[in-house]
Each structure stands twice: as C-alpha cells, then as structure tokens.
A protein has these predicted regions:
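A conserved hydrophobic secondary-structure block that centers on an alpha-helix together
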Residues: 1-24, 28-33, 185, 190
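The conserved beta1-alpha1 loop
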Residues: 310-312, 470
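A flexible loop/linker signature enriched in serine peptidases of the S9 family
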Residues: 15-21, 26-28, 36-52, 61, ...
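Beta-propeller blade signature
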Residues: 2-6, 49-60, 105-109, 148-157, ...
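Blade-edge beta-strand/turn elements of extracellular beta-propeller
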Residues: 4-18, 60-72, 105-117, 161-171, ...
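Hydrophobic beta-strand anchors of alpha/beta hydrolase catalytic cores
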Residues: 305-309, 337, 466
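Non-catalytic accessory segments flanking enzyme active sites
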Residues: 51, 77-96, 100-135, 141, ...
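Active-site-proximal cap/loop segments of hydrolase catalytic domains
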Residues: 326, 332-333, 339-532
C-alpha cells in the first residue's frame, strides 16, 4: 500500500507505505492511520491475517506505531477504522473471531474500548444515529425475539447505554431474503431477493420508520444499488444485468425516474436464447431453484451440450450476470447454460446457508445432483452431454460431483479447488473456513471425510473426463489440492487433464489475456467431450 496524492497524481514522497501482506491501512486523519499487517513473528492469525492493529503517525517508522488492539491466537482477522461522518466522528475496532462471528468495539478518545454488545453472529453496521443488525441467529432483545435473516435497527447511543428498543426493517419469508442495503443522506435502501430476483425498497428513518416507493427500479435480472454520497445526497447508483443483457449503469435521485448513464458493450448475439427459472426437488424434498439459458429453438431431445455451474457456500448467492466468455464460448454456439442456487449459498438468507454447513454439507451436493437430474428429466440434455464447472468452494463441489455422482456427467472442470479436506485447514487461509466445513483435526473428521474428494476417490470407479486448473500464485486455496488429485487420478489411469497458471492468484489469471486463455481451455475441453 502506497500513499497517493490525488492533486499531483503522484505517490507521496516518504508517505505511508505498507509492504505486501494481507491487511490494510485506513485513515484516521491526514497524518494518522490505522495499520493492520504482518508486523513480524506472532502478528498473524493461524489463517494468515493480521492479529494486531496499530495507530501510526506520519513521519514515524511503522515500528513506532502504537498497538490499539491485539486479538487472540485463534482469531481470524483484526482491523480498525474511523467514521468520518461530520458530527458522528468515532472509531471502531473489529475482531473477527471466525468467518461468521465477530466483535465490534467503540474506541474512546483515551484509547478505551467499549463493546457493541450485539450478537457475535450478527453483521453490525453503524450509520449516524443508527445501529443496524443483520441477524444470522434468533436474537432476544427488549422482550422480543427477532428471526434469523431479519434486519433490525435502534438508536446507537441508546443501545450503548443499555436500551434495547429495536425496529424490524426487514423480516424474511419462505421465498425472500435480504441481499443488502445502502444508506443515503436521508433514507435506507433495501435490496431484497424474492426467489433470486431483486426488488428494491426505500425506508425513511425515524421513531416510526416509513416505507417510500422506489420509482423506476430496474426489473431485469440482477440489480445492484449503492449510494452516490451518503453524507450529502439521496442519489443512488443502479446496476442491472442478466445472462443476455450487458450491465447498465443508472443514477437515480430517490423518488425520481433513473437516468441511464451507460451500458457495457454487447459481446455476443443473445437474440436466439431465452432465460428461464426452474425448481428441482432435492433428496430431502427441498425445492432448489436454478436458472436456465437455452436456445429458443431447443429440440428437447436430450442431446444439447449443457453446462451446469455452481458454488453453494459461504452465504454467497449465484445470480444472473452477463459474461462475454460464456456468451461467445458457450451460448452463441448453441450450448445450454444452467446456474444452480443450491443450499450453502445466500439465495434465501442464513437459513439456506446454514442448511449445508459442516455435517450437513452433503445437502449442497444433493441439491446440485437433483438439478442435474432435472435437466435430464426435462429432456434438455443427458449425462453424456452434461458438463459441470465450479471454482474454489465450487471446486470442492466439483470434486464431490466427480467422486460421488460420476454417472451424472460427461465432463467436469474443477477450478482452484479444495479437495484434500484433511489438510485444508493447514494450507494458506484454510483455517479461516473451519466455520464452514469443520475442523479436520477433531472428531469433525468423521463427517468431513464424507465430502473430501481426495479421500473419496476410488481407482476402481469410472470417472468422467476431468480438467483441473489452478494457479501457482494462489494465496488462498493452495494449488496442492489440485496437484494431489491430478496425480492420484493420473496414476490410476483416469481421463484427466491439468493446467497450472504460474501467476494470477485465486482468480487463476493475472490479466485479460490469461483469463481468455483459461476460458478458451475450459470451453474447448467441454465442447470436445459433450458434443460427441
């Protein structure tokens, strides 16, 4: 991290500088920053993230910075920041204990820390007068119980004084969840997903929060919203996209029709395709949604080369989006594309995510297999014409499709994957994911082994053609996962291919040329296998 002067357009001589490491700098004032980084031995968590945050004055060496907070050895991440909002200037320290648990502290002028005594599992936000909690678990406060997935608000100062009078701003239903929210000068805009389709709502803060219509909200695909300036304006940026429509950027003053500013270029002809949403029935009876992009003239004879993509983890939602790579490499050539919304993701809020945690991880894989079956039942494709792709946690998903459901697929692309779940917590950032998968060094291994592809591999089984891709420079998921699995399958004489880019980090590619190469590699492999 280097300090940059926006006026002179040059790096500041002898300015704040942080060597390459996980962490960051955040401004307190012009001459003071919070710094959280690798300070040397003992300063990082077991996940490789900062465990210490310091206050650093301009003109002094980093070694002279004053420690503000030091976490415990088993913590995941420590950071701090300053709220610059006029009239609400204050400092916060955040202690991330595990992936879904953190503590927030208000830092006093004397350096003292007062805990914001909200549930560790809740996502906490402070804006001007308000404390907003996004709940992952039931929360009892002020004689009421608030549901997981709810967004609740209260006066921040009153909360710190011990009062617990919350207002429910959003409560989930069976088919809706909160995708996010953004503040403007006078309003709070909620981005709600209803069966994985975005809807925007506007709230006016006060003793009695009131709803205000969002005029002219985009109605296609995936919608994003962000404040232009939450201190001085009620304008918001709006983005809208789907599988066949490039992202459009608009600006809207709340209460007025949005003005379209620009759109990304069109990279492929989508006029011959149609977007649908279907629901598959998983093993336990759960209805699992997925999106389908298919040719309008599809024959429905089970022969269409079809690519099923998924992730299913960390409460991350898979939503429609425009991709030139998918369009040119797959759709424009007549391929069918399906995007799975399996459990483990965030499509229906915390309950959808938590349904596939740890010992229940198998439900995510059962969901994905059910979608594969549904595609066949609808006569869109058949196993020999059905391919699947996923990366990172989605690479773990692919590994389980490979080892547990090999008969359902004709080809599998496994990208930057986790595969050896006995060792994952000891490799790079792996320890930070134990809240998702469990700790393999404890009795958790009894269920983790059931979704560890490296340990599920059976040399006597037939497996579909497989392509592994990874990056030597991946600093999140170690390339050893892909390397070991490749070696195991190759030694057993399986139909397997491997490509390791020597740079690119967890994204797998360092620039557009490398990204294009990786996409071309994957789609060429899939066409070769699925169009037979």
């Amino acid at each position: 991290t280097r300090e940059f002067d926006l006026t002179t357009k040059q790096f500041v001589k002898d300015g704040f500088f942080r060597a390459e490491a996980k962490g960051g700098l955040s401004w307190i004032d012009r001459d003071t920053v919070y710094v959280y980084t690798d300070f040397g031995k003992g300063s990082l968590t077991s996940s490789g993230y900062p465990n210490i945050v310091k206050e650093w004055k301009r003109g002094t060496p980093m070694s002279a910075a004053k420690t503000v907070y030091e976490g415990k050895p088993g913590d995941m991440y420590i950071a701090a920041g300053h709220d610059h909002t006029p009239g609400y200037e204050r400092d916060f320290v955040n202690r991330t204990i595990a992936f879904y648990n953190d503590e927030l502290y208000l830092r006093g002028a004397d350096g003292s820390l007062a805990k914001v005594d909200a549930p560790n599992s809740a996502q906490k936000g402070v804006h001007k007068d308000w404390l907003v909690l996004e709940l992952r678990e039931p929360y009892e406060a002020g004689g009421k119980t608030y549901k997981p997935g709810s967004l609740i608000a209260t006066d921040f100062n009153a909360f710190m004084a011990g009062k617990r009078a919350f207002t429910t701003l959003f409560e989930p239903t069976d088919n809706s969840s909160l995708a996010g929210y953004t503040w403007t000068k006078d309003y709070l805009v909620l981005n709600v997903m209803e069966d994985v389709k975005n809807r925007l709502f506007v709230l006016k803060p006060g003793k009695m929060w009131s709803k205000v219509p969002f005029v002219g909200a985009p109605t296609i695909g995936t919608v994003g919203v962000g404040a232009v300036d939450d201190e001085d304006s009620n304008a918001v940026w709006l983005t809208a996209t789907d599988f066949l429509t490039p992202t459009t950027l608009s600006i809207a003053e709340l209460g007025k029709q949005p003005d379209v500013l620009k759109s990304n270029p069109v990279f492929f002809d989508g006029s011959k395709s149609v977007i649908e949403q279907h629901f598959a029935t998983s093993k336990d009876g759960t209805k699992v949604p997925y999106f389908l992009v298919r040719p309008k003239a599809l024959a429905f004879d089970g022969t269409a080369p079809t690519l099923l993509y998924g992730y299913g983890g960390f409460e991350i939602s898979m939503t429609p989006g425009y991709s030139g790579g998918i369009g040119k490499g797959w759709l424009e050539k007549g391929g069918v594309y399906a995007l799975a919304n399996i459990r483990g993701g965030g499509e229906y809020g915390p309950r959808w995510h938590q349904a596939a945690l740890k010992a229940n991880r198998h439900k995510a894989y059962e969901d994905f297999a059910a979608i594969a079956d549904d595609l066949v039942a609808r006569k869109i494709t058949s196993p020999k014409h059905l391919g699947t792709m996923g990366g990172s946690n989605g690479g773990l998903l692919m590994g389980n499709m490979l080892t547990q459901y090999p008969e359902k697929f004709g080809a599998i692309v496994v990208q930057v994957p986790l595969l050896d779940m006995k060792r994952y917590s000891h490799l790079l950032a792996g320890a930070s994911w134990m809240a998702e998968y469990g700790d393999p060094d404890t009795s958790d291994w009894s269920f983790i082994r059931g979704f560890s592809p490296y340990h599920l591999f059976d040399a006597k089984k037939h497996y579909p053609a497989t392509l592994f891709t990874t990056s030597t420079k991946d600093d999140r998921v170690h390339p050893a996962h892909a390397r070991k699995m490749m070696a195991l399958m190759e030694a057993a004489g399986k139909d397997v291919r491997y490509y390791e880019n020597i740079e690119g980090g967890h994204g797998g590619a360092a620039n557009n040329a490398q990204s294009a190469h990786m996409n071309a590699l994957a789609y060429t492999f899939l066409w070769q296998q699925l169009a037979k």
